[in-house]
Amino acid sequence: GMGGQSLRTIRNTEVRHLEEETKISQELIDSLKDSNRAVPIVGYQILGVAPQEYKIGNGLIVEPVGVQTDHIEARFLNIIAHKNMKENISQCCDSVPIEIAEDADDLIAPLALADAVLTPGEKRSGCVLVDFGAGTTTVSIYKNNILRHLAVIPLGGNNITKDICSQQIEEEDAEALKIRFAQAYIEPKENDDESKMYNLDGRCSINAILLEDIVEARLNEILDNVSNQIVLSGYENKLMAGAIITG
């Protein structure tokens, strides 16, 4: 599926003023969706769309077909990425050849992951799915069974490895030290042994407290960015199902 640092979501609103109070038809909804898809975004391409709600009068509804109104405001969340991303993937598949899905939504990796990992209850109650990768961390936020926000943070496990490398350790050994000894959280102790070393089969070693500090610092940076994305989404106090972590 399609992922990467350029993948993110932006909001858009399409409005229709009707000459008289009319029952909303599926054709009108399709027209609003087409207008949203046609909005130009310089340097980017719309890969998928998550309709949010439709504002009719003072209310917000998800299924507006059949409702009487003379004014409708459609709110969309567009999933975008650099223009050449889909083209590059298509060219790679053509050269193999591999048949790709016709529905672009099926190609968006975070959406496919959410469908595989999250329960309907979690999506309905509201949750944030955090996917820790090697080079990136992807944040997907759901509420009322609708994708509300998606962002890719350009930080991941590789950054921790590089931080360990800064201690004059080869990358392969740094990765092995991370996998074998690193922990996301360590219970504070009053009498930590400052001389304790983590040894990698005699090839290299690192002070245990130093490794813990390196990992903690980078993870705090990543989690601060995740927290910031939750705030930017506007749903920080509405995620009753909490956070689901994968990666």
Identify the meaning behind each predicted range.
Residues G1-G3, L129-T136, Y142-K143, P154-N158, ...:
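A short acidic Gly-Thr/Ser loop motif
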Residues M2-V128, I146-R148, E170-E171, A182-E212, ...:
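Nucleotide/phosphate-binding catalytic cleft detector across ATP-hydrolyzing
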Residues C93, D131, I164, V226, ...:
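Residue-level signature of catalytic and energy-coupling elements of molecular machines
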Residues T136, V226, K238-G242:
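Active-site lining segments that contact anionic ligands and/or coordinate catalytic metals
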Residues L150-V152:
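Residue-level detector of high-confidence beta-strand sites
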Residues P154-E170:
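A conserved active-site cap/scaffold subdomain adjacent to cofactor or substrate pockets
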Residues K162, I209, D213, A217-D224, ...:
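Feature representing long, continuous alpha-helical segments
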Residues A174-L177:
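Small-residue helix-packing motif on alpha-helices
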